[in-house]
Design a protein with these regions (language model features):
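A short helix-loop-beta-strand connector motif used in the catalytic cores of GNAT acetyltransferases and
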Residues: 2-13
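A conserved beta-turn-beta hairpin within the catalytic core of GNAT-like acetyltransferases
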Residues: 31-42, 102-103
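Conserved beta-strand-loop-alpha-helix junction that forms the acyl-donor binding cleft
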Residues: 65, 77-91, 110-111
Length: 113
């Protein structure tokens, strides 16, 4: 976390309500594999359950990240997704409300224990 807070190609922002941290977003910009253009990649986005105005706080966090990617870093696209599968319907609705479009799919392969 400390690395991402200090590296110029990483973004880290906390949401505070009262005297408590209630949410965060972090991500980075990276060049595409076959192009020098930049892609914004969200790595974590969370607002604590039970937080008043949770969706609004989450949207503000994500808009801050998107603005940083597109305006400050001049990325051509921002990629984000629900890879945890927590409240997926609500998360999908919030993404769409913020202007994201759904594409592709995410798969995982886990080590057997």
């Amino acid at each position: 976390m400390l690395y991402s807070m200090q590296h110029p190609d990483y973004y880290f922002m906390l949401a505070v309500e009262g005297n408590e941290y209630v949410g965060a977003v972090c991500g980075q910009v990276v060049p595409f594999y076959f192009s020098p253009e930049l892609l914004g990649l969200e790595q974590a986005w969370y607002v604590r359950e039970g937080t008043k105005n949770r969706a609004s706080i989450g949207a503000k966090l994500m808009h801050g990240f998107v603005d940083w990617c597109l305006e400050t870093k001049k990325a051509v696209m921002v990629q984000s997704g629900d890879v945890a599968g927590i409240r997926s319907v609500g998360v999908d609705a919030l993404y769409r409300h913020m202007g994201f479009t759904r594409y592709g799919a995410v798969y995982r392969y886990m080590r057997e224990t």
